[in-house]
Amino acid sequence: MSALLSPDQLEADLRAIGARLYHDQHPFHALLHHGKLDRGQVQAWALNRFEYQRCIPLKDAAILARMEDPALRRIWRQRIVDHDGNSATDGGIARWLHLTDALGLDRTLVESGRALLPGTRFAVQAYLQFVSEKSLLEAIASSLTELFAPNIIGQRVAGMLKHYDFVSSDALAYFEHRLTEAPRDSDFALDYVKQHADTVEKQALVKAALHFKCSVLWAQLDALHVAYVTPGIVWPDAFVPDRDASRVAA
């Protein structure tokens, strides 16, 4: 039977999971960050990623609803504000739509979800189901992928600005905000997990939760790679840049 880890040992194990499985290791991200994708492939990435962005506040609301401690709720609810904003023109969702606008995608198409890859939809729904059905500790632990976000954000912004003349720093404003939001959120979640994962069984559960979340992010990139890189098998109802030219703004 495994021994109970100290909080710092648990953190080390969690960071090791991220180092091995976080989606910064996925080949699609290497292509994106090194300028190896064309405009249509970048559009497909942004359109599909919106489904994940759209569901982040739904995920956080599901977690919030299960918190009995008002102090904990006051901290967690900031995540919802970060993405929903205080109006329709601010927050993470609005900033992601600003990116898809800048890439030339029709906003109605993006928001409708009509052109999503099935793999994107299924991965995001699996994540929502996970945080709704698992323990609060597991749900919070699943958010720990944010520990690794600042590094990939830095790579993404620098790489996209360097290699794509159709991308501007203004279009990438979403990521600038996440550079401060993600560390704040992950620091809190990590402290919570280290404090509350106080048995061998709970420690195994939080590690499994992070492993699962990494698989959710990886699966979304798998779907994009199969459809838009190789072998190029696109779901008939999903976004296809050439075919959908009439549905993409000029």
Swiss-Prot record:
Q: Pfam families given for it? A: TENA_THI-4
UniProt keywords, alphabetically: Oxidoreductase, PQQ biosynthesis
Transmembrane intervals: none
E.C. designation(s): 1.3.3.11
The UniProt family comment states: Belongs to the PqqC family.
Q: According to its UniProt entry, what is the function of this protein?
A: Ring cyclization and eight-electron oxidation of 3a-(2-amino-2-carboxyethyl)-4,5-dioxo-4,5,6,7,8,9-hexahydroquinoline-7,9-dicarboxylic-acid to PQQ.
Protein name, UniProt field:
Pyrroloquinoline-quinone synthase
